[in-house]
Regions:
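Solvent-exposed coil/turn segments that connect beta secondary-structure elements
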Residues: 56-59, 88-89, 105-106, 114-116, ...
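Extracytoplasmic/secreted proteins, especially bacterial periplasmic and envelope-associated proteins
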Residues: 74-78, 82, 91, 95, ...
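Short, low-complexity disordered leader/linker segments with a strong preference
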Residues: 1-50, 62, 91, 133
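Short, solvent-exposed loop/turn elements at domain surfaces
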Residues: 45, 58-67, 91-93, 119-121, ...
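Gly/Pro-rich hinge or "lid" segments in bacterial periplasmic/extracellular proteins
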Residues: 176-182, 189-193, 200, 206-266
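Aromatic- and charge-enriched surface segment that lines or borders ligand/interaction sites
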Residues: 98-162, 204
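Short, well-ordered beta-strand elements
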Residues: 46-57, 108-112, 135-138, 203-205, ...
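N-terminal lobe/hinge region of extracytoplasmic solute-binding protein
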Residues: 52-104, 249-255
Length: 266
């Protein structure tokens, strides 16, 4: 991955976010779908992102599934890609998903994912493919009481078949039992919740009733992915809650190579 060295000098009242491009962003129209992780940056390609910000609140978490704070979202959505993106005008554009739609009035939504998207570490080293299983793992995390502690649960609880039942089920377990749950085939999540992964690059969400606007919600953090392989590498859910820019995995256009609370993000 092409990297450029970025530096940020924090001023007394102004901070800035400089994120190093990792070349793994969404493919534009006409591209093959490859992330181009080994290719040189094209002429004119943005490799550094600079966002001036007043020094207010800092990041509380690097787990995009856990937070609904604007400060966290502004940073983390540049590091992690979800299914879809929205323009300032509200138009939906492909993210990890390159095709999506419903054939039954919005009761069931299917998203076809782009192949070749990689999870990478802070140095741009490839760790794993980003697949539909990661989006299922993300939803399991959201609906697991002990993993998520009620953050970002309202939309899936109200919309997805079996979501509320699974959330209540996890509350009946011990913390140790609940933290050990995954979204793997044959798991309680896969049996109870309306999230199906028929292959590595297809994920289907089944709603309680017809939701013709469900795709507009696919930009929200509650539908973001998490790699179970990363969870395992870090040592489990507790370690994910405590992860930082140095040990998290990225699948978006930028990595955060340096983070100093209240001072610097590079």
């Amino acid at each position: 991955m092409k990297k450029t060295v970025s530096r940020l000098l924090a001023l007394a009242l102004t901070a800035a976010l400089v994120l190093t491009g990792c070349g793994g962003g969404g493919a534009s129209e006409g591209e093959s779908g490859s992330t181009g992780s080994s290719a040189e940056a094209a002429e004119g390609e943005i490799t550094d992102l600079y966002i001036p910000r007043l020094l207010t609140r800092e990041l509380e978490t690097f787990n995009i599934l856990y937070s609904q704070r604007q400060e966290d979202s502004e940073n983390l959505t540049n590091l992690i890609d979800g299914l879809l993106e929205a323009t300032p005008e509200g138009t939906l554009e492909p993210g990890i998903a390159e095709e999506w739609g419903s054939e039954d009035g919005g009761k069931t939504w299917t998203f076809k994912l782009r192949e070749g998207v990689k999870w990478v570490d802070v140095n741009g080293n490839e760790k794993a493919d980003c697949t539909a299983h990661d989006f299922a793992s993300g939803m399991e995390w959201i609906l697991n009481f002990y993993k998520n502690d009620s953050a970002n649960t309202s939309m899936p609880l109200e919309m997805l078949e079996g979501a509320n039942e699974y959330y209540e089920y996890t509350k009946t377990l011990s913390e140790e039992e609940a933290l050990a749950l995954t979204a793997e085939e044959g798991s309680p999540f896969s049996e109870m919740v309306g999230v199906d992964v028929p292959d590595d690059y297809t994920i289907t969400y089944t709603c309680i009733t017809e939701k013709p606007y469900f795709d507009t919600l696919a930009v929200y953090q509650c539908l973001y992915p998490i790699s179970q392989a990363m969870v395992d590498e870090l040592g489990g859910p507790d370690a994910v809650q405590a992860m930082n820019n140095e040990n998290m995995w990225y699948n978006g256009p930028y990595t955060m190579t340096s983070y100093i609370q209240g001072n610097e993000k590079v």
